[in-house]
Amino acid sequence: XXSVPAFGHYLPAXP
């Protein structure tokens, strides 16, 4: 769920 902002883009993090 949700995503985490990383290096100017978003990575999947969990559901």
Curated annotation (Swiss-Prot):
Keywords: Antibiotic, Antimicrobial, Secreted. Signal peptide: none annotated. It is found in: Secreted. Its main location: secreted. Plasma serum. GO terms for cellular component: extracellular region. Antibacterial peptide. This is Salmocidin-1. It comes from Oncorhynchus mykiss (Rainbow trout).
